[in-house]
Curated annotation (Swiss-Prot):
Any one Gene Ontology cellular component term annotated for this protein: cytoplasm
InterPro entries per record: Ribosomal_bS16, Ribosomal_bS16_CS, Ribosomal_bS16_dom_sf
Keywords per UniProt: Ribonucleoprotein, Ribosomal protein
MF terms (GO), sorted A to Z: structural constituent of ribosome
Organism domain of life: Bacteria
GO biological processes: translation
Family to which the UniProt record says this protein belongs: Belongs to the bacterial ribosomal protein bS16 family.
Protein's name according to its UniProt entry: Small ribosomal subunit protein bS16
Length: 83
């Protein structure tokens, strides 16, 4: 089973809210997932991103691959925390 960490779209028309989820790569974008790790709201000023770092690290250690977008958001959050 190929597991990935990706964004699942929710919210209203023209006002997206994305959930950061762990899902089987074969499932639909907004379909079944294994665990919800956090949330990304791009419409707020600067974008609001929150993720459970402990669970994220757990899934990475288990072999889950983050999507390109999730990888960038996590790296941006870690850089902001260090500064």
């Amino acid at each position: 089973m190929a597991v990935c960490i990706r964004l699942a779209r929710g919210g209203k028309k023209k006002k997206p809210v994305y959930s950061v989820v762990v899902a089987d790569k074969r499932m639909a974008r907004d379909g079944r997932f294994l665990e919800k790790l956090g949330q990304y709201i791009p419409m707020k000023e600067g974008g609001t991103f929150a993720i459970n770092q402990e669970r994220y690290a757990h899934w990475i250690s288990q072999g889950a691959k983050p999507s390109e977008t999730v990888g960038k958001l996590v790296a941006k959050q870690q850089n902001a925390a260090e500064a």
